[in-house]
């Protein structure tokens, strides 16, 4: 169950270190296990999310933290939008204009994550927006491959050329901002 403490004060996104139970519940419902011994890492710089730029009132700053796992270093993460390999966490983006983009390099149209250390052959297709960027790393231990698709940035008729729909788990994970504007999902 999510509470206000699970979200940043200055941003609409949830805090990765607060949603491990959410990842475990989702994984359990899909028949996989994502239990892992994460290491909590906290960045030295403060995080001022989207609410900070929308208000002229004083506001609280957040600390941006993430959960590391040695297994992430072995993952092959491909950003197909820009045809390049990326990391699970891009620490350079953590000091940029939108620090939340440190999670899987932000909102990209198509990302694949291959986990050579997975104890399963299960695959996940995740239709998502930016909210899943911090959740997806927590699902990596339960899957051999995760394909992240943001259909706001890729034509749905092109999906079959990128994704082989054959016995994968499928998860639709969108914020209320996207769900309340269904035209974004066409």
Model-predicted segments: where are they?
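Extracellular glycan-modifying ectodomains
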Residues: 1-186
